[in-house]
UniProtKB/Swiss-Prot annotation:
Residues 1-18 have a biased composition (Low complexity). Belongs to the ZPR1 family. Residues 1-32, 439-459 are annotated as: Disordered. GO terms for biological process: apoptotic process involved in development; axon development; Cajal body organization; cellular response to epidermal growth factor stimulus; DNA endoreduplication; DNA replication; inner cell mass cell proliferation; microtubule cytoskeleton organization. Keywords: Cell projection, Cytoplasm, Deafness, Differentiation, Dwarfism, Hypotrichosis, Metal-binding, mRNA processing, mRNA splicing, Nucleus, Repeat, Zinc, Zinc-finger. Its main location: nucleus. Acts as a signaling molecule that communicates proliferative growth signals from the cytoplasm to the nucleus. It is involved in the positive regulation of cell cycle progression. Plays a role for the localization and accumulation of the survival motor neuron protein SMN1 in sub-nuclear bodies, including gems and Cajal bodies. Induces neuron differentiation and stimulates axonal growth and formation of growth cone in spinal cord motor neurons. Plays a role in the splicing of cellular pre-mRNAs. May be involved in H(2)O(2)-induced neuronal cell death. It is linked to Growth restriction, hypoplastic kidneys, alopecia, and distinctive facies: An autosomal recessive disorder characterized by pre- and postnatal growth restriction with microcephaly, distinctive craniofacial features, congenital alopecia, hypoplastic kidneys with renal insufficiency, global developmental delay, severe congenital sensorineural hearing loss, hydrocephalus, genital hypoplasia, and early mortality. One of its GO terms (cellular component) is perikaryon. This is Zinc finger protein ZPR1.
């Protein structure tokens, strides 16, 4: 069969058909494709490599993929047909994040054992109820489940047990007793807590209830200590020479980065912008020439406000979708009518309209590969489809809803279309932050006044 658009040759003497129009350029190949069981083009790369067990040649398979609601990783699998040795590990394909991350999961049912887990080399795993810890850099990274983490720990403890028993080592019996306790955890005989602490910020624990909030999972972002920076191989930058003062408010600065969609080199534009009736912010926009992906992010240009801000807007018609909106990285979003909550740091900082943010939220939910194909859960798929339909109704103005922005740092903003008068459909509240909120912002240990007294000699 001839290819589409080609001209088949006719009999001798026939008129020559006009040449076909040039074919459109092929779509750019993405280095990291979303993980999916139905993507036939997503095939691993096979590389012949040396087996470190028998020193014959084995096969390494590399898969560049993308974890939903997370980022890019490289899955590596080695197998040797000569000695049967095999090994699987993962590596983060992205940079070390600006902050470390700590996942605290309360395991209460067998369903929690099936949560997807990305554990990097630098992540430490703890189970406080058993006083059990797997230190950082003691295991290779893995793409597994909660049950897989425990099974891997059991295998590690059982590895040298025959030698301990042969030597009549007293620790062998205690390790056997501990292994029994770990096996009981796999049956969830009683609730327990799993903590994954990764200073690099590249580990991940799945939220099976997405886009709803997961009450069993607490995600904490924190600033790394100097010891953790050294452990990750990060060196402190030398102080730069003080440049001459420049007015950058009217200039657009550029710096090189990688596209978050296809990981190709791209340019990011950055500019300082004054928002009316608010403050200065830094807007960064990236346009990828390889795949056409566009994104923008907003960073606060000022300090943390003395009080947190909670903005509640009653959406009554489609005209509310045109309101300008600034969502900082520390701002969470809630829509009570949809039982939906978007946590801090998700989607990053954004300067857009209300419609733009709602569409970003809908896209975040509907593009989750775990809700598509044969790997999807029918009940979860129906919930997400219903969520998407209700979100469309809100955007079109056919459904009234409340839109709540809660920013402990006080650096978020929603346009008041009646300014300088009060907006009858919008309520702005200022509140005092809790201890936990100050802890997440890194304010509890920050001393900005009277710190000289601590350096003065004792009299």
């Amino acid at each position: 069969m001839a290819a589409s658009g080609a001209v088949e040759p006719g009999p001798p003497g026939a008129a020559v058909a006009p040449s076909p129009a040039p074919a459109p350029p092929p779509a750019p190949d993405h280095l990291f494709r979303p993980i999916s069981a139905e993507d036939e083009e997503q095939q691993p790369t096979e590389i012949e490599s040396l087996c470190m067990n028998c020193y014959c040649n084995g096969m390494t398979r590399l898969l560049l993929t993308k974890i939903p609601f997370f980022r890019e990783i490289i899955v590596s699998s080695f197998s040797c047909e000569h000695c049967g040795w095999n090994n699987t590990e993962i590596q983060s394909a992205g940079r070390i994040q600006d902050q470390g991350v700590r996942y605290t999961l309360s395991v209460r049912a067998l369903e929690d054992m099936n949560r997807e887990v990305v554990k990097t080399d630098s992540a430490a795993t703890r189970i406080p109820e058993l006083d059990f810890e797997i230190p950082a850099f003691s295991q290779k990274g893995a793409l597994t489940t909660v049950e897989g983490l425990i099974t891997r720990a059991i295998s590690g403890l059982e590895q040298d047990q025959p030698a301990r028993r042969a030597n009549k080592d007293a620790t062998a019996e205690r390790i056997d007793e501990f292994i029994v306790k770990l096996k009981e955890l796999k049956q969830v005989a009683s609730p327990f807590t799993l903590i994954i602490d990764d200073p690099s910020g590249n580990s991940f624990v799945e939220n099976p209830h997405a886009p709803q909030k997961d009450d069993a999972l607490v995600i904490t972002h924190y600033n790394r200590t100097r010891q953790q920076e050294e452990m990750l191989g990060l060196q402190e930058e030398a102080p730069a020479e003080k440049p001459e003062e420049e007015d950058l408010r009217n200039e657009v600065l550029q710096f090189s980065t990688n596209c978050p969609e296809c990981n190709a080199p791209a340019q990011t534009n950055m500019k300082l912008v004054q928002i009316p009736h608010f403050k200065e912010v830094i807007i960064m926009a990236t346009n990828c020439e390889n795949c056409g992906h566009r994104t923008n992010e907003v960073k606060s240009g000022g300090a943390v406000e003395p009080l947190g801000t909670r903005i509640t807007l009653h959406i009554t018609d489609a005209s509310d979708m045109t309101r300008d909106l600034l969502k900082s990285e520390t701002c969470s979003v809630e829509i009570p009518e949809l039982e939906f909550e978007l946590g801090m740091a998700v989607l990053g900082g954004k300067f857009t309209t209300l419609e733009g943010l709602l569409k970003d939220i809908r896209e975040l939910v509907t593009k989750n590969p775990f809700t598509l194909g044969d790997s999807s859960n029918p009940g979860q798929t129906e919930r997400l489809q219903e969520f998407s339909q209700k979100m469309d109704q809100i955007i079109e103005g056919n459904m009234k809803a409340h839109f709540i922005m809660d920013d402990p740092a006080g650096n978020s903003y929603l346009q008041n279309v009646y300014a300088p008068e009060d907006d009858p459909e919008m309520k702005v509240e200022r509140y005092k932050r809790t201890f936990d909120q100050n802890e997440e912002l890194g304010l509890n240990d920050m001393k900005t006044e009277g710190y000289e007294a601590g350096l003065a000699p004792q009299r």
